[in-house]
């Protein structure tokens, strides 16, 4: 990954560290995603058992992320990976799930250790963007010209509002031009480059460390 992309990954991780994201609780992230991927709401007790933590420790960690989704019984239904419909369809092991943003679809297969089939509309035209993402690579992109929009928020209280809701697929770079005019500090990357961007970010979130090259 080139130095510009590395700097972008570092800025993203720094923002997530300040926004109550998974990097502040790396012990929680993978087990929670694995439980959510089963397609059923997740209880605090299930997470406590999976992480060898107490229920109170789990509740405290979940409370650090105000974007966590719950059902009417207080069970977790979403945290990046979600059981609630979004534009980003994410199928793993035959289970239809969703993600909060386009970049999530590229990084979660590595976390889950499972391939995923992704379908998401171009944010400008509605043209379906379809991907197959393995834990270690993207194996197909249709259309091949698809790009991902990326923003770098400044340690927001809500990662979902400031980051996820701005990270879309576009069928072509040209399709993203109008959106970029409205978001001049954002950028768009080819899917393969966005995947590479996500790799050090994923590692940082799993370990709680910032990527190499951070000051």
Swiss-Prot record:
Protein family according to the UniProt entry: Belongs to the MerB family.
EC number: 4.99.1.2
Function according to Swiss-Prot or TrEMBL: Cleaves the carbon-mercury bond of organomercurials such as phenylmercuric acetate. One product is Hg(2+), which is subsequently detoxified by the mercuric reductase.
Name of the featured protein: Alkylmercury lyase
GO molecular function, one term: alkylmercury lyase activity
Membrane spanning stretches: none
Domain of life from the UniProt record: Bacteria
Pfam families attached to this UniProt entry: HTH_15, MerB
GO biological process: response to mercury ion
Keyword line: Lyase, Mercuric resistance, Mercury
Catalysis: reaction(s): an alkylmercury + H(+) = an alkane + Hg(2+)
